[in-house]
Structures are given as C-alpha cells and as structure tokens.
UniProtKB/Swiss-Prot annotation:
Coiled coil: none annotated. Keywords: Calcium, Cone-rod dystrophy, Disease variant, Lipid-binding, Membrane, Metal-binding, Phosphoprotein. Pfam families: DDHD, LNS2_PITM1-3, PITM1-3. It comes from Homo sapiens. Belongs to the PtdIns transfer protein family. PI transfer class IIA subfamily. GO terms for biological process: phosphatidylinositol biosynthetic process. The lineage of its organism: Eukaryota, Metazoa, Chordata, Craniata, Vertebrata. This is Membrane-associated phosphatidylinositol transfer protein 3. One of its GO terms (molecular function) is phosphatidylinositol transfer activity. One of its GO terms (cellular component) is cell body.
Length: 974
C-alpha cells in the first residue's frame, strides 16, 4: 500500500510535498558511497526526475514542481491511483520542460533510459541533424500543387547539400538528414479571387491583362485571414509529427538525440511559424514555461511580466476600434458584436470568424494569457482550439522568401498586444533568407526593433568565393555595437516607438541582465562579450525580445537583370532558386554545424581560417598591396603534386590577380593547410610562407610531417583577403598504374574560337569512369598554361568527370608537346608510376611513343590515317563502341599494384570556381563577336538565377567556359 500510495497522483497544488518527500527519502536511503561521475543506466520511477538535478537551481526546481502539479490537474481529484505509464509520462514531460529552459535537445535522454529498461542495447545514431523541409510552394501556386515538383525541389536541395558537404564539410557527411513535409497551398483561393478582380479579367486577349495587376502582397494576408487557415496549421503539425515518428522508427533515426531544424519556403514558412508558436503554449507547458521554451534564457521573461501592465493595458484600449477579437479577452465587459450593415448580416459567418479569432489567440496564448486569466462569471469565452503540437523541439528555423513580416504586421495591427516582444517562436534562432527584389519577401527585424529599418540586412557570402564564410559576425550584440549611434537613447531618428518601450532609463536597466545573459550564453568568442559590454544601454532592451542571439534578416545576391522580368514571374524564379543555391546551403551548414563559433588553438595546428571564419583578416605586410589589388579578381592556383612514398613532398602555388596574371602577390603571408584525415574534414596548418616577387611559394614538407600513402586536399590561404588555391597531394606506392588523358585531344569535340563551351565527346566520361572503377589512377594533362586551371577544372566538374590529378604547363611555353613528354617521363622515373593506357589526339602519338608505350595502349580519337595506323589504336567509332569493347574483351583489367592505395571514387568537388569562367572581363575578346541571349530566351530562367554571380557584370547569361584565349598557336594545343 505504501508503494501504491507513492504512485498515486497528488491533488492539485499538492505536488510539492510529494516531491520533497521523494528527495528526502532518496537522501536517506542512498548509500554513503557517492559517485559524482556515474549515472545509473536504469531510470525508474522517482529517480527519473532526479536525472541532471545538478544542472538545476532552486528556482527551476520550484517551477518544476508547479509544472508537475499542473500536469496532474487533468487527472481529477485523485480518486484513482496514477498508473506507472502516466507517471512516466509526467516525468518525461517534466524533464523535457527542464531541458527546454536549459536550451538542451530534448530528444533521446529519457527515451534511451526507456530502452535500457526494456533490455534493448543502446545504439548510436549516425544522424545528428534532422532537417524538416516544410514545402508549401510560392504564393502564386494554384490548387494543391504538383507533388512531383515538390519532390523535385527536395531532391535538388538534397543533392546540393550533399555536394557542398563533400567539398567543404566532410565531417558532416552522412550526419544530416532531410525529410519532406508537404504543406497545403493556402494562397490558391486568394490568388483565384484576386485574379478575378483584375480590371482586364474579362478580356484575355488584351495586352494589359498580362501586366502586374495582381497585388502579390495581399495574397498571404488573405490566406491567413481565412477560417480554414487553422486547419492548414493543424495539418502541418500532424504531418510533421508523422514524418518525425517514421524517422525515429527508421534505421537512420533509432537512438536519435540530435537537433531538429525546420526549413519553410514562402508558404511553408508561414505555417511553420504558427505551428512553432502554437507548440510553445497551449498544451503541456504553462504559459510562463512555454514562453521560455523559445527564449534565449529563462531570465528574459521577467521583463514581460514587468511591462505587461503598461503595454497590454494600453493595447486593450487600442483594440476597441479593430475587429472584435480581443473583446473576448476582456475581464470587465461582456463581448458585444460590432454594429454591421443589414446587407452584411446574411453573409457574415460569426461562428467561423470567432473560431478563427480563437485560433489567433491560441497561437500567442503566452502573450494574452495574462490578459484573460480568469473570465468573469457568466462572461463569454473563446472556443477551445486544439491543433496538437510538435513532438520535437525546434533548434533553428530557416525561412526562404517568406512574407511572415507582412503577416505579423497585420496581426499586430489587429491585436496590438501581439507585439514582437511577446511573440517569441519556440526555437533557438530564426533565419530569414530573401532576395531584395522578391515581391513575396519582407523583413522581420524592424518588427522587433523599428530602428533596424536603417540597418541593412546581412549579406549572405557567395559560396564560390567564401565557402566557409567571409568572416563577418552574425551576432546581434556585434551589430548593435557597430551601429551603436543609431540605438543610443534619444537618437530615434523619427523611428516609431514600440508599444512596450520603456518609459524611463530605470525601466531600461531592468533589461540589462537578460541581454547580457543572451550574449554570453550564445557566443563562444571573446569578441561577442566585448561587443556586448560596449553596447549602449538600450541594447539590452533589444536583445531581450530578439528571436535568438544572431541577426534574423539575410539578403541573398540578386542580379539587377531581374528588374526586367514581370513581377508575377519573380515568385516562381526566386522560389526555385532557394533549392539550388549553394550560398544558402553553405550558410545553413555553417550554422547547423556551428562552424561560425569554433575556438581554434594554434597549438593544435588547425586551420583558423577554415574552421573559424569569424577571425579578422590580417593587414597586408606591404602598403602597396591593397592599392595593387583594387578591382582585380584572384586567379590563384596550386599544382597537383604526385610524390613517391619515400620521396620528397614539395607543394607549389602561385598567387596572381587579374584575368591575364596582371598583378602578382608579392611579399605576403600564405597559410599552407592540408587535410591529413580527409574523412574528418579537419584542416591541419603546416606552415606560413611569404610569396616571392613572382607571387610563388614553394614548400617542402618536413620529413617528420610527411604524409603516408593517400590523396590529400591541400589549401593555400592568403592571409590578407582569405582567397585561396586548392590542389591535391597524392602519395603513391611504387608501381602505381595510371591512365593518361589529354584534355583537349581526347575530350573536346570542338575547338572554341568564339567563346562558347567546348563540346564533350559522347561517352568520354563513361570511359574515364570505367578506368577509375578498375582502380587506376586518372591523370589529366594539357599543354595549356596554369593560368587557365580554374576554367579547365570547372569545365571538368561541370561535366562530371571523375576525380583525377591535373597537370598544366608552367606559363606560356613554345612547345607544349615537349613539356608533356618531359613531365610524364619525370613521373615515371621519380614516382615509379606505370602508364597502362593513354588517350589523346594524333598530336599526342609522338609524346606517348617517346615514353615507350606500345601501340596497343595508345588510343587516339579521330579518323584513322595510314601514317599512324601502326603506332596506335584509332577509336573511329567513338567512345561508346570503345567502352563496349573494353568491357567485353580483356583489354582492361583491375590494377595489379599495391592494394594499400585505395582511390576515392567520385567527381571533381565544388571547390572549382565556376564564376571565374563567366566574368565578362575574362571574355573581352569574345564579347564583341558573340552576343548573349536575352533573359527571356533562356529556356530555364529559374535555374539560371539560382546561382547568380557577385559582380554586376554578370547580369547576362554568358558561356560557362571559353577557351579562346592566349596566343594564336593555342588553337592547336592538344
């Protein structure tokens, strides 16, 4: 009976003695031996609540007890004892509440203990981050939308995420999973209605009917005002929970204890925001705890209670003139319907509108709870709205071109109590991406602080130039410090005041502590603390109501050419661009993997530039360098290096600026980094060198630090501007078998003299991949100068050629064929490689013959000639027939060399810089003879705009590769 009595549910308000008795009994019954670093694997009954007790303070414990009492209220007056399952559910909910307040992930802790109770072994889940993509389309989508189009967007986003992860975030490879949550198209009815209101809707043939007569900004406002909107939010919550439960049951989600991030597009972002806000309040948590769930720290909610008397009381008076939404929340007077015209009474659905008003109030119940606490006896009450809630806690929330700012502005107009201060989504951080020309998007920061309309949004770094970030700080505290004159008291610059703005400096001082708590708790760098300490007094008032510790508005690059497009076409273009944008994907990866705030120790010999982009750039050693490099683009390159296992390892790089190497980087620091363990993704800092007068550095890896057999990415980073050159160091065992391909001779099907892309011979990629699959090392060789490396590598990457070592001539040479022969001979003599097959044109026959290759191993693409018929094998029928012959006969076999060398199979990574090829100043010779197509003629304009370039002279689509540069003799370079 004593045991049953302990399990019985206490009456309301009697939770405190029950929990105190448990604590006392635990302290009495516990043994004298204490193990502070050990924790029981089995958490049963009362012990489950004590998990992590050392992380709580006394105030949290009192709040836990009050929360437990409220969790027990729905169980009745204690007429029946509480079952063990109900008790475990209460304990689980209590533990989740405590974790939310501490900003710890709530999944996995209690669930792991439950698995242990059942005797199931613990499994380590490889998924660390779950990205739930809420895809609702853009505001112009009609009907339910094409499911195949939504699935195609998710597939595109997943493929871009994988490529970027492989290229620059290898440590995250396989640990981030994307799941698709379809959302209803809530704007379809509004779009249909507004389209019928077009003044030219009766005349389809009229030219003006195709103009911009659709008020795009009104569509989301009409959509969220519909009484059916709450059903859409409930549907999204249900679908997200279903996807999450299926994920937990799958092989990728067993034992999952990572973070869950939400990504919402134009329409999905609206639904996701309301779902997050609703999940914070109505069920399970008290209003106080629910508002903390999405806040930065628990102390930030104190100002809400302090100012509610002045802010919300004034909102009661202001809301009298609006639609009768907040009247049901008044305590003093009953609800009175607004006087309406007689013609409106027959079509005005009062019940539906009241239900919708209750839904709006329930979303932000944490704000309006104090205003409505206990209605007067006999007074009207809003109907109960139950939409469910997320089964998971949201870590980061990313918005893609969402009109959420307009929606919140409308709601704040209708319900003045729903100001940015109180409306706090239940997540750690909100990121809102948008293009400045996107008619669907709007800013959010001016809603939280009106003065932010004078602060530009954060520019998302271009992935091609800064794949790991450009070093700018995203912290709100740093932004306030940078623009401190704007936020000083009395410098409002005619900005409208907030409803909850403090009336006097003493009130502002009450917000100082929450702001400091947020800055210190969210940032791991010393710069944020110093910035916060230097912030003005009013900064703490802003940080107390902010949705996270970082900036919220992020602007993506938007080319000026889009101004020529019709406005109604822009939502489709921009919506498609988010799923393909490597800028967005790289930014999300940096935030999710916390690459922005990693502390690097020089003693660990890690890469401060790669792993901590927030570090400031160093000044140039020479004053003239900054002047020389003005308005020129970096054209750095580092040679791929092949070294023998027991031989020297020499890294060579050249750092030039301008399209024709007009400026050399002289006398400046360059960091040399190598990824010694490619699977870990960690860059190791080898050394720092100074460039010579020609912009070159040569670094001989010391013997103690030489690398073993394998392929290692190498990066050379310029200290002054963080530009870099990428290459590979390959350490081979003796006798490694290779296959050589001449890029121009074997791959290019046309000679480009007009600036267009060289065509690829059909089947060429398949033949290269065939040799790679057999284990051979691929060598790409060309007589072109190394200044064209970025362009050639980007062309190979664009056509998915397998990964291999690429070798160029050292500058402009008189006889490129002789240079080829010398280079290959040195590889054979110094690195002890064996060439098993060689491909090229008729000009390469002499090169391969000098190396001693038999005719059976030389494959020439082109028409047979009697002169060379006995010196090579002509592939007159193309690569497709040749590949079939290789697979059918025994001409190709797996390599016989040392099995210690296992080459990674794959294509060229995204470190190639395709924007290098499309810049107009690189194509001066060809622009005068070839006019680009107008934007309207682009068959896939949305794809073309997904990765716009950072310079204004990239407005028109230019060829991705032009090889018509250099001396005239280069037209015949093999």
């Amino acid at each position: 009976m004593a045991k049953a009595g302990r399990a019985g549910g206490p009456p309301p308000g009697g939770g405190a003695p029950w929990h105190l008795r448990n604590v006392l009994s635990d302290s009495v019954e516990s043994s004298d031996d204490e193990f502070f670093d050990a924790r029981e694997e089995m958490a049963e009954g009362k012990n489950a609540i004590l998990i992590g007790m050392s992380q709580w303070n006394s105030n949290d414990l009192v709040e836990q007890i009050e929360t437990m009492g409220k969790l027990d209220e729905h169980q009745g007056e204690g007429t029946a004892p509480c079952t063990s399952s109900i008790l475990q559910e209460k304990q689980r909910e209590l533990y989740r509440v405590s974790l939310r307040r501490q900003r710890f992930p709530a999944q996995g802790s209690i669930e792991i203990h439950e698995d242990s109770e059942e005797g199931c072994p613990q499994r380590s889940c490889k998924t660390h981050v779950l990205l739930l993509v809420l895809h609702g389309g853009n505001i112009l989508d009609t009907g339910a939308g094409d499911p195949s189009c939504k699935a195609a967007d998710i597939h595109t986003f997943s493929s871009v995420l994988e490529k970027v992860t492989r290229a620059h975030f290898p440590a995250a490879l396989g640990h981030i999973l994307i799941k698709f949550v379809p959302c209803p198209a809530i704007c379809s009815e509004a779009f249909s209605l507004v389209s019928h209101l077009n003044p030219y809707s009766h005349d389809e043939g009229c030219l003006s009917s195709s103009q911009d007569h659709v008020p795009l900004a009104a569509l989301p406002l009409l959509a969220i005002s519909s009484p059916q909107y709450q059903d859409a939010v409930a549907t999204v919550i249900e679908r997200a929970n279903q996807v999450y439960r299926e994920f937990l049951k799958s092989s990728d989600g067993i034992g999952f204890s990572g973070q869950v991030c939400l990504i919402g597009d134009c329409v999905g972002g609206l639904l996701a925001f309301d779902a997050i806000c609703y999940s914070a309040g109505p069920s399970g948590d008290s209003p106080a705890s629910s508002s903390r769930k999405g806040s930065i720290s628990s102390t930030q909610d104190t100002p809400v209670a302090v100012e509610e008397d002045c802010s919300l009381a004034s909102s009661k008076r202001l809301s009298k003139s609006n639609i009768d939404i907040s009247s049901g929340l008044e305590d003093e007077e009953p609800k009175r319907p607004l006087p309406r015209k007689q013609s409106d009474s027959s079509t005005y659905d009062c019940e539906a509108i009241t239900q919708h008003h209750a839904f709006l109030s329930s979303i932000h119940s944490s704000v309006l709870k104090d205003e409505s606490e206990t209605p007067a006896a006999g007074g009207p009450q809003l109907p109960e709205v139950s939409l469910g809630r997320f089964d998971f806690d949201v870590s980061d929330f990313f918005l893609f071109g969402s009109p959420l700012g307009l929606v919140l502005a409308m709601r704040r107009t209708v319900l003045p109590g729903l100001d940015g201060f109180q409306v706090r989504p239940a997540c750690s951080q909100v990121y809102s991406f948008f293009h400045c020309a996107d008619p669907s998007a709007s800013r959010l920061e001016p809603l939280l602080e009106p003065k932010f309309h004078l602060v530009p949004p954060v520019s998302v770094p271009r992935y091609q130039r800064f794949p790991l970030g450009d070093g700018q700080s995203l912290l709100l505290a740093d932004a306030l410090h940078t623009h401190s004159p704007l936020f000083l008291e009395g410098s409002s610059r005619d900005s409208p005041p907030l409803l909850d703005a403090p009336a006097s400096p003493p009130q502002a001082s009450r917000f100082q502590r929450p702001g400091r708590r947020m800055s210190e708790g969210s940032s791991h760098s010393e710069s944020s603390e110093s910035s916060d300490s230097m912030a003005p007094v009013g900064a703490s008032r802003i940080t107390a109501k902010w949705w996270g510790s970082k900036r919220i508005d992020y602007a993506l690059y938007c080319p000026d050419v889009l101004t020529a497009f019709p406005t109604v076409a822009l939502p489709h273009l921009f919506h498609a661009s988010y799923w393909e944008s490597t800028d967005v994907v790289a930014f999300i990866l940096r935030q999710v993997m916390r690459y922005e705030s990693v502390n690097i120790k020089e003693s660990a010999r890690l890469d401060p530039a790669a792993l901590s982009p927030a570090n400031p750039r160093e000044k140039w050693l020479r004053k003239r360098t900054q002047v020389k490099l003005r308005n020129v683009t970096a054209n750095h390159r580092a040679n791929d290096v092949i070294a023998a296992e027991d031989g020297p390892q020499v890294l060579v790089g050249r750092f030039m600026y301008g399209p024709l190497d007009m400026v050399a980087l002289t006398g400046e620091k360059v960091d040399i980094l190598v990824m010694a363990e490619p699977s870990s993704g960690r860059w190791v800092h080898l050394d720092t060198e100074i460039t010579n007068s020609s912009g070159r550095i040569t670094y001989n890896v010391p013997r103690p630090r030489r690398l073993g057999v394998g392929v290692y990415p190498v990066k050379m980073v310029v200290r002054g501007d963080q530009t870099c050159a990428m290459s590979y160091l390959t350490v081979l065992p003796r006798g490694m078998e290779c296959v050589v391909f001449s890029i121009d001779g074997s791959f290019a099907a046309s000679v480009s003299i007009m600036g267009s892309d060289p065509k690829v011979r059909p089947g060429a990629v398949d033949v290269v991949r065939h040799w790679q699959d057999l284990g051979y090392m691929i060598l790409y060789i060309t007589g072109r100068p190394d200044m064209q490396k970025q362009r050639v590598v980007s062309w190979l990457s664009q056509h998915n050629f397998p990964q291999g070592m690429i070798f160029f001539s050292d500058g402009l040479v008189h006889d490129p064929l002789r240079q080829k022969a010398i280079f290959l001979r040195n590889l054979m003599q110094e690195c002890f490689i064996k060439i098993s097959a060689a491909y090229g044109s008729t000009k390469d026959i002499s090169v391969y013959s000098v190396l001693g290759l038999p005719a059976s191993q030389i494959f020439i693409v082109g028409r047979p000639t009697k002169k060379y018929q006995t010196q090579c094998q002509f592939l007159s029928e193309g690569y497709a027939a040749h590949l079939a012959a290789l697979e059918a006969s025994h001409r190709s076999r797996p390599k016989k060399n040392n099995s210690r060398m296992i080459l990674r199979k794959g294509s060229f990574g995204l470190h190639a810089q395709p924007e290098f090829l499309r810049k107009r100043n690189h194509l001066r010779r060809t622009m005068s003879v070839q006019q680009p197509d107008p934007p309207a003629a682009n068959p896939k304009p949305e794809r073309a705009q997904s990765q716009p370039e950072s310079d204004k002279d990239h407005e028109r689509p230019l060829p991705a590769l032009s090889w018509a540069r250099g001396p005239p003799k280069f037209e015949s370079v093999p």
